[in-house]
From Swiss-Prot:
Gene3D superfamilies (UniProt xref): Ribosomal protein L9, C-terminal domain (3.10.430.100), Ribosomal protein L9, N-terminal domain (3.40.5.10)
GO MF: rRNA binding; structural constituent of ribosome
Biased composition range(s): Basic and acidic residues: 185-194
Name under which the protein is recorded: Large ribosomal subunit protein bL9
Role, per record: Binds to the 23S rRNA.
Native species: Hyphomonas neptunium (strain ATCC 15444)
Database matches in SUPFAM superfamilies: L9 N-domain-like, Ribosomal protein L9 C-domain
Disulfide topology: none
Region: Disordered, residue numbers: 166-194
UniProt-listed GO biological process terms: translation
Length: 194
């Protein structure tokens, strides 16, 4: 199906482009959301008449998104989640979680605007892209930790997972030393009894 785009759409085109898309994509997404018109003579004329208004509306939306992006720039959202000793989360952090954290911090971010390549499954700092408009994108930091104290340590640059592993290794070494000492002591005692 041929459609006329009313706004810039990634991997499809810019305002006014006439592109071919699958029927379902046009009928179920582009047309109902007001992102495109069916490409026929009537709609081509209508688009040309309304082109300036459409471009002005898109420019206003882009400017509003740019203002929000300037506010979001450098923002760090802290998410407290349960995790194992290795730093592996029991669940995962999704786009919805990031959007809710942004809302709680007073920013207006839609879940669909958050771009995660894959869910976050470990504690630590992650960079997440937020696309507020087709032409406006911003990177934010997501700090996933088991407690607010860990989150503060991570913000200062400490690698919590490495610290946990070092702590676990030190504890294992200490226990191994205690076991070796106990075995040596038991060996000495055994020699006295015989």
């Amino acid at each position: 199906m041929q459609v006329i785009l009313l706004e810039r759409i990634d991997r499809l085109g810019k305002i006014g482009d006439e592109v071919r898309v699958k029927n379902g994509f046009a009928r179920n997404f582009l047309i109902p959301q007001g992102k495109a018109l069916i490409a026929n003579d009537k709609n081509r004329k209508r688009f040309e008449i309304e082109r300036d208004a459409i471009e002005a509306r898109n420019a206003a939306a882009r400017d509003a998104a740019q203002t929000e992006a300037d506010n979001l720039e450098g923002a760090i959202f802290v998410l407290i989640r349960q995790a194992g000793e290795t730093g592996q989360l029991y669940g995962s952090v999704t786009a919805r979680d990031v959007a809710e954290a942004a809302e709680a911090a007073g920013y207006k971010v839609d879940r669909a605007a958050v771009r995660l390549d894959k869910p976050i499954k470990a504690v630590g700092l992650s960079e997440v892209s937020v696309r507020l408009h087709a032409e406006v994108s911003v990177k934010v930091q997501v700090n996933v930790a088991r407690s607010t104290e860990e989150a503060e340590r991570q913000e200062k640059g400490e690698d919590i997972v490495a610290a946990l592993q070092a702590e676990n290794q030190a504890q294992a070494d200490e226990q191994a030393g205690e076991l070796a000492a106990a075995a040596a002591e038991r060996g000495d005692m055994g020699g006295d009894e015989e």
